[in-house]
Amino acid sequence: MKKTTQGGHTSHPILSALVAIIVVALIVCAYIVLGPGPTNFAGGRRVELSAYQAQDPTGVPAELKSASLVERGEYLTRAADCLVCHTAEGGAPFAGGRGFVLPFGTLYSTNITPDVESGIGGYTDANFLDAVHKGIGRHNTKLYPAMPYASYTYMSDADALAIKAYLFTLKPVHAPAPANSLVFPFNQRSLMSIWSLLFNPDRRYEPNVERSAEWNRGAYLAEAMEHCGECHTPRNLFFALNNRQKFSGSVQGGWRAYNITPDRSSGVGAWSDADLIHYLSIGHADGRGTASGPMGEAVDESLSHLKPSDISAMVVYLRSVARVATADLPEPKTNPAPSSPADGMAANADSHGKAVYEGACAGCHGWTGVSPVIAFATLTGTRAVNDPTANNVAQVIIRGAQRHTANGADDMPAFGDAYSDAEIASVANYVTARFGVTGSQLTVAHVAQLRAQD
């Protein structure tokens, strides 16, 4: 029904409401699309690399500057963490085929060995740069952002081509990637052109002249190479990184990538530099935790191969990012649990979780949470057991964990086949109640979902 105003004009309430909704939607979209870049938090003046007067933050560290192109490319391939994503379980290195379960389907990584038919053997330098920087494969194929080209876009041309030079020395493996299984509209690759237009700046790293050379090196490694934000930064409605919440944590592949901002309670603000250096270098820091899942892979195949100067530079950079609190993560409990299993918190009335823990876990992890066997197995003070979701605790129980050290490998066996979803939920809830700030309420259904990430 139309209403007539005093001026004789007719108003349309429905139309007015629709216009208001559209305006609000446009404002929200603009807010999302016009988000800050990964290093904007630092302020200061950025310049093109060619105009930067201090030490070049790109390339390899000083001790490798005289190495051959292929040797430099091998180091940078490690720094870019290519192997993990492009190797299927039991498959040939770099031959692709690893599946990534996403909310809208499953994507498979591609073959990046120099096989001409199924790999990158036919790629020119220009083709390779397009893939790394723009998400455009050979024959103009649009790549999905599971390939982190929105981070790799900051990689210098020289570094990208050094990686290509190394990859082309590998043995060609004929291994076509399995077909992706994505629901509509995500199965329409053409939409990636729009996504890239909105969220991929296609811009190389620009050093910040008001920050130190070490900071710039750390920024380049964390953003352009190691692409830390791809796991540790939440995503917006369009699956792009939300840098307003930079490094505040996210869930990737069923694993929780925790807050790595300087927040003291929920991030790494209470960690010493030595803690961070040890964790990044070997995947463990006493009293802080042991890397597992995707972070464990990143340490094993990438971070542990970096020179100490590069690890230190990354720590300098991590210390500088904006502090963001994660609401559901309390400051970890650092005091051990009682030495007697009869004392302390019990997760559930029937003590089923306690029984499972006693039979399978206590021998290595102890009743106090401080391992009587090896420091890597200590639970006290770790983020995972203080996470009220118990997500990563359950994942480690299901899949196990392995840390590679100078003295060999330290393993925690996988119990996914040995215990039911109900048993895993019970023992995970017991662990968080006994050793963490508060007990979790992990459900059988959640454990089943975690299993499905295979």
Language-model segments: what does each one mean?
Residues 82-85, 228-231, 361-364:
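Short cysteine clusters
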